[in-house]
């Protein structure tokens, strides 16, 4: 089973990153994608992935929260990072109109620039969309024929938004949000709509600790070693075998990010 979204650069992991990776391996995780959210963290993510060859890979990008930082220098940094074998996708990029930590215009500019970079480099994109679906689709759609693949990470949208993402050919990343007894109920009902070959799972660790884990972890910090819990729950709600789902999400990740 492959975890496509781990924020291993987070300071929450500063004291025990190696142990976190070991616990993930011991839990049966077969690969992890470390998320880059700005230039510095993308460089850090690449170094962390380089230290775990064959198990960790990384993305290089600028999250919409950091879109105001976008510059030609940052674009050049991402381009250089993309030459590294561990860097397998551009992102995390997209739009976030919930927190609005960067102006909408800055977000759209940085998003479009990263889609252009991914198209130029023939790399898949790791996408973020929160409360911005209409503009997200408007910026993304013209680039789709030129992209080598795309996954919308941490999908928490509506049925209409899911159907639109699937119509655009996107893969869909599901996190432990779906395990939330209150917030995750609508998303839970949408799981059977996602084609088997376009479903990916992720922890988004250290965030989004699954709320239905029993016994509850002593720490509120999420870890990639909890991915098996998400796999088991999603398999139950989709009405399929957890073992088959674990194998399939690994295959899907390796196909999208061209790791096979």
UniProtKB/Swiss-Prot annotation:
Record-stated family: Belongs to the metallo-dependent hydrolases superfamily. TatD-type hydrolase family. TatD subfamily.
Organism: Pantoea vagans (strain C9-1) (Pantoea agglomerans (strain C9-1))
Disulphides: none
EC number(s) recorded for this UniProt protein: 3.1.11.-, 3.1.13.-
Taxonomic lineage: Bacteria, Pseudomonadati, Pseudomonadota, Gammaproteobacteria, Enterobacterales
Single GO molecular function: 3'-5'-RNA exonuclease activity
Gene name per UniProt: tatD
Family matches, as InterPro entries: DNase_TatD-rel_CS (IPR018228), Exonuc_TatD (IPR024918), Metal_Hydrolase (IPR032466), TatD-like (IPR001130), TatD-type_Hydrolase (IPR050891)
A UniProt-annotated Pfam family: TatD_DNase
Protein name according to UniProt: 3'-5' ssDNA/RNA exonuclease TatD
Residues that hold a divalent metal cation according to the record: 92, 128, 153
């Amino acid at each position: 089973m492959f975890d496509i979204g781990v924020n291993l650069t987070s300071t929450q992991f500063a004291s025990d990153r190696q142990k976190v990776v070991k616990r993930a391996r011991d839990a049966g995780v077969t690969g992890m994608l470390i998320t880059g959210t700005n230039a510095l963290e993308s460089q850090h993510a690449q170094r962390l992935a380089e230290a775990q060859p064959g198990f960790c890979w990384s993305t290089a990008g600028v999250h919409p929260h950091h879109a105001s930082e976008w510059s030609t220098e940052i674009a050049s940094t991402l381009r250089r990072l993309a030459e590294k074998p561990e860097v397998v996708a551009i992102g995390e990029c997209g739009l976030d109109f919930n927190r609005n930590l960067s102006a909408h215009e800055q977000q759209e500019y940085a998003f479009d620039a990263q889609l252009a970079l991914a198209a130029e480099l023939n790399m898949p994109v790791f996408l973020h969309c929160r409360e911005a679906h209409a503009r997200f689709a408007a910026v993304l759609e013209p680039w789709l024929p030129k992209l080598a693949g795309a996954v919308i990470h941490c999908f928490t949208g509506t049925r209409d938004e899911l159907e639109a993402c699937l119509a655009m050919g996107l893969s869909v990343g599901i996190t432990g949000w779906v395990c939330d007894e209150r917030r995750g109920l609508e998303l839970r009902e949408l799981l059977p709509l996602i084609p088997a070959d376009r479903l990916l799972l992720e922890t988004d660790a250290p965030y989004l600790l699954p709320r239905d884990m029993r016994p509850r972890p002593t720490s509120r910090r999420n870890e990639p070693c909890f991915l098996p819990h998400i796999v088991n729950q999603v398999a139950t709600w989709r009405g399929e075998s957890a073992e088959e789902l674990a194998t399939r999400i690994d295959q899907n990740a390796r196909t999208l990010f061209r790791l096979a």
